[in-house]
Each structure stands twice: as structure tokens, then as C-alpha cells.
Amino acid sequence: MREVTGKSMKLNRDLEKMLTEALQRDLLVRIGWGRGGDEKPKNGEIGVITHLPPKSRVLLLGNLGECAGAMNRGGTFTLQGGCTSMAGAFQVEGRLIIEKDAGDRIGANMSGGTINVNGSVAKEAGSSMKGGLILVRGHAGNRVGAGMHDGTIVVLGSVGSEPGVGMRGGRIIVAGSCPPPGDGATMRGIEQAEMKDISEYLEPLGLSIDEDALVLVTDVNSPSIGEQPECSIIEGFEGIAVVPTTQDRLASHSPLDPYTLILPPGEEEGGLLFPIPWLIEEIGTGNSGPKSATQPSLVSENPRDIDLLLIDEKNLVDSVDSLINCAGIVLNLAKLPVMNDAEIEGLLVSLSSKIKNSALIMLRDRVDRVDHLFRLVVELDLDGAIIDASSPGGGRAAAALPRIGLAARAMDLVNQGRQLMIELDEPPSAEDCLIARGAGCSIVVAPAPDENLEEYCAWLDSTIRGWMRELGIDGIEMINRKNLRAMDYDTAAITGLRLIGFERPLPIWLGN
């Protein structure tokens, strides 16, 4: 763990304790001063002072890193200093005051509340915002309001190039100089009704706006954003067979160990136990019966203590109420705005500060971005990754296996003890679980059947045990690539597996 990460998590956990008492007594939480009033400013902490509850008040002295004051739920955060990117991002309610300069994408994806910056801001302020108000007393960088859907941005200084590019709603009011708007925006003069509306916010701050201010709004003639291609799996593992090696089959009375224990790297205790190597999507508290009740799930809300909580833009703010109950978190990069490594780490620090120390922390993305995904897992020192086998336009699950394997080998994930899970779009069979395990993915992530989950879990457990006896292995971790065969030339070509009958990989894979 980096020093700044440790400092940030400690600050968040200390704040949780202070907020409890402060809310009861209606007190202001002061951070950055000693008991005697001497200044001890913070410096560079990331993902801190997030998820502030309603009526909370925090004053902090210092300069902060990424995602400061993000996911605000109704509190007031005053920063006596500056900050880097994504300050106030995903804010729902409340108020953020920054007394110096702020970095890129301040207020990104916010949907309510106000952000007041007494200095200047860098590029893409208010990008993709859906509501609320951002006031910048100084200047704003390039592409202010990029992709915004609603809300208001007021810049009392000048703005950089391409203001309002890609905007689909809302308005940007610029009191200083403004270059031609970007694609998707058009410019006009400010109206009297708008001046009156904005003055209600500016006058209490001792500010005003002139009649020559410019307003950027959506260009109704701009082209549409475009529809995202649908991601799917057009073929599963049908072209792959599971075969025994040289071992004899096991007797019917032989004890078996089909359990899979997922541990954080370097740990030997705790972890998450899977009776079947299957992480069930979106079941959670509805499980009933002895089999399904002990099987971990991947849920977006109401997790049990054996469930992983999937976090994306939809539940990023509200997930804070469920974090203490879950066995770990999975940050879904495929359904979050594009962020750099430091911003992703800021979100993870914010979330992981509120979970148990033993909880797992993982990332999820599609297989076509697996190299980037694994690099993040290693550089941010996370516990593993979920790789979605689907692709835009339709992909083959078998084709995902070599991509995952080669990327994992390049990053040395197996030797580091990091866990890999592959996501399919249909309830898994025993063969699917064994094939995934043999290819290096400990767990299959897949939806539950439409009916009777308990019976399905019992059938899957029984079938896996039968396969283990036939393969001659008493522990599911013993299966590997030697137990897998490509059933046809096409599958052998895309997977690098041994072609059944030929009993070796195709020549194009030799040396790889």
C-alpha cells in the first residue's frame, strides 16, 4: 500500500468516528489543526471526505488529491486549499467550497447541490453533470461543460477552447472571454430572467454578473451521441471438452474437495469460500435453501456477509450504506465514466475505507480491455478481477481464454496470488466451471436460472463431483489446461488448446 493510500484511508476512518458525534451535537468537524490550534495541513490525500451525510459539516486545511468531496449526499465540505481532479464528482446534494484552484473534471457527473470554487479550474469542469450548480470565480480550462445533460455552470472569468462540446442540456454562463462553442453547443446573450435567477445565488456571496455575459446551451441541430453496440456472447465453451489425464478414476466413496477459497494476496486466513465455483449474479437476500444460502452472489444492493457488492455509476453514492455488510467490492469499470489510474484509486480508497479489513477489492471490465484491467489490478495492489467474456457485436467465450491467460502471464498474476473470475451470460454447467478453472479462472460469474436455484445448485454440485471422480482428482484446484481439449480445428486455432485426437496444440501456437 502506498503511503498516500494509507494516509487517506486513515483520514476517512477517523472522519467516520468524528461525524457520528458531530451530527448528534450539530458540530463542525475541523481537520488540519492540532489541539492547540496550530496548523497541520493535509497534503495529497485521495478519495477523502466522500459520501458526506445530510447536515454534516467539515472544514479541512490543506491540498487534496483526486476525488476530494465526491459522492456528497447532503453535507457541506469547505476546503481551505486546492485539489486535483474529480472534486465533487457524483455529488447528489450538499455543498462543496474550494478556496483555491481545482483540477480537471470538477463536479463530473454531479446531479445536485452546489460547488463553489474561489480560484480557477482545469479542463472539463462539470463534464456529464446532470444537475446542480458550479460557480467558478476564476477561469476555466478547455471543454468546460463537456457532455453535460442538465444543471448550470457559471464562470466569472474566461474559458478555454471548445466550451460545451457534446452538451445535451443545461447551460454554461461565461462572464469573461469565451471562444466559439464546441460541437453540440450554441452561444447567445444572457436574458434578464437568467440574470435574476443567477443573482439569487451570487448576491449573498458579494458577486454579480454583467449584461454582456454569454450563455452556452444545446444546439438542437447537433447530431446524436450514437447508440452503444450491444455486448453479448454468441458461443460458450461448446467447442471445448474436459478429459482425464493419466490418473485413474476415483472410487465412488473417495472424499472430494470441490470448494474454492478466494484469499487476498499474501493472506492465509479469512477469504471467501465457494462451495461451487460459481458467483451468482444478482440474487443476494432472496436465496433460500442450504445450498443456495451458502453460495456467494454478486449483487448491487442488500448484500449478505458472503456477497460481493458490484459498484457502478448507478449505485456509487448509495452503496455506502451496504459496504460494511459485504464480503468485498467489485468496481465495474465498464459502467463508469472514463477515468485515469489516480481517479480510479481515489474511488477505491473512498469505498475501501468503509469496508472490513478482510474484504476483497476487485475490478470488472470486458475481455477486450483485459490488459488495461490487469495492469490496474497489479499497480493498485488489488485482490483480483472479473473479466466479462462478452464483446461488442457478440464474442466467443472460448476466444476469451487465451487473451486472459496471456495477459495474466504477462503481469504474473498467478504467482502474485491474485484471483481471476470469468463472466458468462447463462447459468453455468459443470463443464463450464471445470473449463474455466482449467484455463486459470477460479470462479465463473453467471446469472441464476429462472426457476429453482436450490435444485440447480444441488445438481451442479453433484455433477462437478461426478466429473472430479472421472478425472481422477480429489481437489478442484488440480484441474489444469492438460485436462482441456479443443473439439475442432477452429476452437484449437483460437484457444491454443490441444486438438482432440491430435493431442497437441496446433503449430501456430507452438512457442507461445
Where are these regions (language model features)?
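Gly/Ser/Thr/Ala-enriched C-terminal appendages of enzymes
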Residues: R143, D150, S158-I233, A410-N415, ...
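N-terminal capping/small domains of soluble enzymes
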Residues: R2-R57, G206-A327, T463, W467, ...
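Structural motif
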Residues: S56-V58, T76-F77, R95-L96, T114-I115, ...
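Long, distal/terminal scaffolding or interaction modules
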Residues: M1-V243
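Catalytic cores of large soluble enzymes that bind and process phosphate-bearing ligands
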Residues: K7, L11, T186, I190, ...
